[in-house]
Amino acid sequence: MKLTFLAATGLALLALTVPGRIAAQLAGEPYIHDPSTVIWSDGRYYTFGTGGGGLMSEDGYTWHTGAVRPGGGVAPDVIKLGDRYYVAYAVGGGGMSGGHASNVKIMWTKTLDPKSPDFKFNDVGVVASSDGVEDCDAIDPAFLYVKGHLYLSYGTYFGNIRIVELDPKTGKRIAGNKPVNVAIDMEATDMMYRDGWYYLLGTHGTCCDGANSSYNIRVGRSRSITGPYVDNMGIPLLKGGGKLVVDGRGRVFGPGHFGLLDLGDGVQKFSMHYEADMDRSARSVLDIRPLLWKDGWPVGGDNFQSGTYEIESERSGWALELAVDFVRIETMRRRGPGGPPPGGPPPQPAAGQPGQTPAAAPQGPPPGGFWGPPTGPVTPIPDQTLAQDSAVWPSGNIGVDMYEYMIRPHQKWTITPVPDAGGYPGSPYFKITIAGTDRALAATAESEVVTVPAFTGAPEQLWRIDQLTDGTYRIMPKLVPNIKEPLALTAAGASTPTLAKFDPTSDKGRWNFRKP
């Protein structure tokens, strides 16, 4: 049998030495400022930004221009209700031209596809405003629809953040509804509802200065849509409070303009922009990242980073591995002469002397056993090598199973993005290979998983890795041959991996990635 051994690339080495490195990973041209919540419409994802227009994507990973939004203005948001897409945006304000007088306007269309015959924006009108003198600047609108009610938050550092209620059937302001002040010292707000709590997210810090911007996203919560909103320390948002959700890291600065992207089955993500991506000329760029929940609070997760990992089942704690014969690591395993192992029976009396122990009988653990004192130098035992482990591997396809992680080569997986293979919201597709080889994990037409001798780029060898809201991961092949429904890697038993429909209520389909 012949194995292909691969040298570590610079990217893989970086991923090993800097785990969890945050980077704006989206492909294409994701250049935008103040993006609206990412939304799906007629086969594409869309987001709109300040100044009109926006971005679109077929898979949520590679983005390009082409989205159309009339009206200009700043910091739009979008929501779908029934057969309508409502778009809110602000005209004026924001300190532009030295003023804070602004109007929040709403329009709607039945599709966001500019090539569709149904693409036509219909004006609803002004739903909120500021006169430039009052303690509010009516920009940065954001929608929330919950329990049959449609709400809109808006505002910036110049005064209060406010919430008003709209008619979900028309998008107009409900007659007689008055704005409620809910926060200060933030802008670019958004709202969520979860488990009886309303969450108000806002962007703190400075904006619009590239790598010198200090934008960061913070949150408070309330049992009522109108507040009072407080953070995890009990500080009201009306007094400047806010629990950190995400800030800049690595070579990206100034995250702002949160937008929830709920993909279902325990997968939530959020869109935002970075004020500056230092690997893209410090331009403002779109990013999509996992959203986690901890103790009732949202936390920004990290998109999966390439590297070499143990893949551990949340169900059993056992590791995914090749189903091959176990190769022993040869170390001393016999006890030395003249004494029992620790905890063993005491020495027996010598013949003819009942109840007496010979003076020469050894006491305690003898030298020479692995539990006894060493008789020579203490030296590290090297890990088993790939060549040693693979000597017993068969050729052709090899199945997989799960077992206690024992730092064996057949339990170590290298995971790397596949160029030009597309992706899914926030990330590219990955290949999963046994470390140091090209042997790749693949889905079969029988809804099982095997490893094939070499990665070919076939869709059943491409893997989607989504972080779930509890921090574990869901692993899914891009395609299962002859199967239309999406399936996920699942622990059918403590030691048996398979492919099955993902169950968000079970640990069977949840996995962890640990550095070996």
Question: Which residues fall in each region the model found?
Answer:
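Conserved positions at the start
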Residues: I32-P35, G73-A75, A138-D140, M186-T189, ...
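Disordered, low-complexity segments in secreted/periplasmic proteins that are enriched in proline
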Residues: M332-I381
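Beta-rich carbohydrate-recognition and catalytic domains
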Residues: I22-I139, L144-M186, Y193-V246, G264-S306, ...
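Bacterial N-terminal signal peptides that target proteins for export
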Residues: M1-T9
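Signature of short aromatic-glycine-proline-rich micro-motifs recurring in repeat-based ectodomains
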Residues: G248-D262
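Extracellular glycan-recognition/adhesion modules and their associated mucin-like linkers
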Residues: G301-R334, G376-S395, I407-E446, R464-A494, ...
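N-terminal signal peptide c-region/cleavage motif recognized by signal peptidases
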Residues: T17-P19
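A structural signal for short hydrophobic beta-strand segments in well-ordered beta-sheet cores
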Residues: T37-V38, V78, F143, M191, ...
